[in-house]
């Protein structure tokens, strides 16, 4: 096992302390947000705790691996055992509710800590990237709640660790971890195919585009990734048995659709969660290289035209507007569906990311980054629902890729991905519903 430096160990200890503190905060009060899926997740977990394996909530869309793992933890803790199925379905267990919820969240924290530890082994003591990984806002919030993201990210990172970092040849182990990754979230089927895709593109782009070389090597690729081919086959069988749907429940709400507007939402999402990205635009304005500036303007105009074209493929779920507390509602009504605001946003995004294209075009011409772009597009451009959680896998994979790359551009780009603690404090913590309640109660207690 790789040696972990003292600074990295210290950061890991601080992370554990932060998780313990935030777990205390989130469990100080029993109130759960109106838009939270946690009650559904807890109910399903309690059904498994009491061996009701055939019951599955129709509102849950993912495979049940997260709830199975959480139920195992609750059983070991002797919590939730002996509750009647009818009581679980009707939520008639309010007296012990907070105990079950709290222990289920502990399981999520354990999964998150394992993920962070594995990531720390892979990044070779790149503490900047480790802090970014930990503080990444949308994932950070779900790290101590009962959500599928914790299991999904864990097995995706674990699969990458064994497949590419440790170069394990045990196909059964890789098949097992890859399967667990897909069983935690269906869209992970795209990300475990990242490596076969990269291999195919490396052969295809060898010296020049040559499909004959690719076809000649296709059986070698299948042999190398036979475990992935088997998982893909099982997933295809599931897809057709499941009436051509990727999800378990709410099939009508998650019909695969071409949704290129997700690219716009993804770019805006990056801008919102990584405020340092904005400095790149400032640097480009200050740059005195006229040739580079002309290239930047050219790239920005092309990007603006593309983003406008993508906006034609906008899909909006009606229930977003029916729920006044849904965060996407404010984005749609306040920015995206107001023509002037949307144009201003697209112009800004175009010039900002145009500067990145100008500086890092050499980097993103590499096969692994082309593969990353393809997997990203596949993972969220077939989904009608705009959900920031769907972007997490792509961001984490990008962190891994730039860490593995020794190019000057990669090292520089890693600094732009650094999500500083100012953003962590003022953005992430404000989204945690318990903090507001705690501050209000403390203020009332001491002032009044």
Where does each model-flagged region fall?
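Start-transfer (signal-anchor) and selected internal transmembrane alpha helices
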Residues: 1-26, 124, 294-301, 363-365
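Transmembrane-helix motifs of polytopic, lipid-linked glycan transferases
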Residues: 102-126
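Membrane-interface alpha helices of multi-pass inner-membrane proteins
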Residues: 130-131, 135-140, 157, 162, ...
């Amino acid at each position: 096992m790789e040696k972990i430096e003292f600074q990295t160990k210290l950061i890991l200890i601080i992370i554990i302390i932060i998780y313990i503190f935030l777990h205390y905060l989130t469990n100080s009060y029993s109130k759960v947000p109106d838009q939270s899926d946690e009650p559904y997740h807890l109910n399903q977990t309690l059904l498994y705790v009491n061996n009701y394996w055939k019951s599955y909530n129709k509102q849950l869309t993912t495979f049940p691996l997260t709830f199975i793992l959480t139920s195992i933890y609750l059983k070991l803790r002797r919590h939730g055992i002996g509750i009647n199925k009818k009581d679980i379905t009707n939520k008639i267990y309010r007296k012990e509710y907070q105990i079950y919820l709290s222990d289920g969240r502990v399981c999520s924290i354990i999964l998150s800590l394992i993920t962070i530890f594995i990531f720390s082994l892979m990044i070779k003591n790149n503490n900047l990237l480790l802090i970014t990984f930990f503080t990444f806002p949308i994932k950070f919030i779900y790290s101590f709640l009962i959500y599928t993201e914790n299991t999904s990210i864990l097995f995706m990172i674990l699969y990458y660790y064994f497949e590419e970092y440790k170069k394990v040849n045990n196909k059964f182990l890789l098949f097992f971890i890859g399967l667990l990754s897909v069983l935690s979230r269906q869209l992970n089927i795209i990300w475990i195919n990242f490596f076969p895709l990269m291999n195919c593109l490396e052969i295809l782009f060898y010296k020049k585009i040559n499909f004959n070389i690719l076809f000649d090597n296709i059986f070698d690729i299948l042999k190398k990734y036979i475990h992935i081919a088997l998982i893909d086959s099982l997933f295809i069988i599931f897809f057709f048995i499941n009436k051509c749907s990727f999800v378990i429940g709410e099939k009508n709400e998650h019909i695969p659709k071409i949704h290129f507007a997700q690219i716009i939402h993804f770019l805006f999402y990056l801008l919102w969660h990584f405020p340092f990205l904005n400095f790149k635009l400032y640097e480009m304005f200050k740059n005195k290289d006229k040739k580079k500036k002309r290239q930047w303007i050219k790239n920005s105009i092309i990007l603006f035209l593309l983003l406008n074209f993508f906006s034609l493929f906008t899909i909006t779920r009606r229930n977003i507007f029916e729920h006044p507390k849904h965060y996407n509602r404010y984005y749609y009504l306040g920015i995206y569906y107001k023509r002037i605001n949307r144009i201003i946003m697209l112009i800004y995004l175009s010039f900002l990311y145009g500067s990145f294209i100008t500086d890092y075009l050499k980097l993103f011409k590499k096969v692994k980054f082309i593969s990353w772009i393809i997997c990203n597009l596949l993972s969220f451009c077939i989904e009608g629902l705009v959900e920031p959680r769907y972007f997490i896998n792509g961001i984490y994979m990008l962190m891994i890729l730039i860490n593995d790359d020794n190019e000057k551009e990669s090292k520089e780009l890693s600094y732009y991905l650094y999500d500083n603690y100012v953003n962590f404090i003022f953005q992430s913590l404000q989204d945690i519903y318990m903090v507001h309640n705690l501050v209000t109660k403390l203020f009332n207690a001491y002032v009044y």
